C-alpha cells in the first residue's frame, strides 16, 4: 500500500502571514514561500511482482547491450555495454536461482515499456546517445526497485538478491556517468 504523508506547514505559514499584517510605517514582511515536504514510504511489492520487474530489467539490459555491441560507434559505449551485459547476466542468474526456490520463474519476455524502449533504440539514428539516455532511465528504475525490495521486500529469499543487484546497479550508474 502506498502511503504519502504531507508534513504540516500550514500553521507556520499562517503565523508568518499574521505577522505580516499592516503596521504603522514599518516595512511589510513578505509571506514565506512554503513548499510542503512529501515523504513517500516504500511500496511493498510481492515476490512475484519483484521477480517480474527485475527480470524485465535484466532482459532489457542484456538485449540492449547486445545491440550496442553491434551498433555503437563510440568505443566507450561498447565498453559500457560489455560491462552491463556481464553484470546483468550475473544478476539474472541469481534472480533465476532464488526465484526457482520460490517457484517463481523470471519472465523470458520484456514488459511492454521495456519492449517499446528496445524498439526505439533499434530504430534510433543516433544510437550511442539513445543507448546512454535509456541506460540512465533503466538503471535508475532498477536501482529504485532493488533498493526498495532489499529494504522492505516480502521474501527473505529474494532480499539478498535485491541487495546484490542494488550494489551492481550503483556501480553501473557510476560507470555510465564516467562514460559520458
Regions found by a protein language model. Give the residues of each.
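His/Met- and acidic-residue-enriched segments that coordinate or traffic transition-metal cofactors
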Residues: 2-8, 19-180
Amino acid at each position: 500500500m502506498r502511503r504519502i504523508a504531507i508534513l504540516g506547514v500550514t500553521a507556520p505559514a499562517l503565523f508568518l502571514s499574521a505577522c505580516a499584517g499592516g503596521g504603522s510605517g514599518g516595512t511589510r514582511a513578505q509571506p514565506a514561500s512554503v513548499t510542503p515536504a512529501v515523504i513517500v514510504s516504500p511500496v511493498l511489492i510481492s515476490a512475484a511482482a519483484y521477480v517480474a520487474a527485475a527480470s524485465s530489467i535484466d532482459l532489457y539490459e542484456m538485449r540492449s547491450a547486445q545491440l550496442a555491441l553491434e551498433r555503437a560507434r563510440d568505443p566507450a559505449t561498447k565498453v559500457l555495454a560489455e560491462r552491463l551485459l556481464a553484470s546483468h547476466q550475473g544478476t539474472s542468474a541469481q534472480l533465476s536461482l532464488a526465484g526457482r526456490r520460490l517457484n517463481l520463474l523470471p519472465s523470458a519476455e520484456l514488459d511492454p515499456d521495456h519492449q517499446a524502449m528496445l524498439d526505439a533504440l533499434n530504430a534510433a539514428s543516433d544510437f550511442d546517445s539513445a543507448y546512454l539516455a535509456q541506460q540512465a532511465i533503466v538503471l535508475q528504475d532498477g536501482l529504485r526497485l532493488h533498493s526498495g525490495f532489499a529494504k522492505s521486500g516480502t521474501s527473505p529469499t529474494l532480499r539478498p538478491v535485491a541487495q546484490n543487484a542494488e550494489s551492481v546497479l550503483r556501480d553501473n550508474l557510476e560507470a555510465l556517468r564516467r562514460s559520458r
